[in-house]
Amino acid sequence: MHHAIEYHHFSCQGLQAGNRKRTPVGQLLRITRGAALLRLGQHELLLQAGSSFWLCADALAAFSPLSGCEYDQLNVSLRLDQPQQAGWLEATPLLDALLDSQARWQRPQEWQGAYGQRLQVILDELQQCAISQQGYHDLQTRWQALASGQPESLQQWAQQADAPVEGLALQQQWQLLQALRLLKGGSKPAQVASKLGYANEAALQAACQQWGVSGDDGQ
């Protein structure tokens, strides 16, 4: 990190298969459009637009934005006071407004100027926010049913009035994400295709193209 606090905004044109790793900084992940998957410990959480999640430093996690996802990422150096547990962060209206303004920032991004001062205020506000281990219970229950392939889970997902992503799109990207993880682990494409229900290697490659996965991720 160049500075003690860094802000980034990302727009994902395709599925991004995040690597499972420990990061030596605290991270705030705030979804502003679409949805993302966060693998934390033994859990695979669905983060939807409007939700924020705090990852404490050195938490073992894999963050995988789905196609069309937009999100803010705030990195906080261990030199600074910050929350010590991971969980759903209940962002205050002020924190949301400050992060929205950072995404639209047009002036020079100078740490010693207004930009850096704004980041300091964001960190101060972040530390006032409550963090919960449980969040969006109904959504997570429906997501887990879909992820495990339970009967009628797709229909139940469609019954949500405010689903963050269309059910079939979520199901297909989850299937592909599992495939990409196996490929990164050294499994052969033919084995992966067979294990995850693809007709053949060509079908797996077609899924990569459909969801905008780069050649490097799809190997």
Q: Model-derived features: where do they sit?
A:
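Generic protein-terminus/edge-of-domain signal
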Residues: 1-35
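Ligand-binding loop in jelly-roll beta-barrel domains
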Residues: 59-91
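Short acidic-glycine-tyrosine-enriched beta hairpin
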Residues: 41-57
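…primarily DNA-binding HTH/wHTH and HhH modules…
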Residues: 202-219
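Short alpha-helical "recognition helix" segments of helix-turn-helix
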Residues: 189-196
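Short, Lys/Arg-enriched anionic-surface-contact patches
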Residues: 160-175
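Histidine-centered metal-chelating micro-motifs
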Residues: 18, 53, 58-62
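An amphipathic alpha-helical interaction segment
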Residues: 91-160
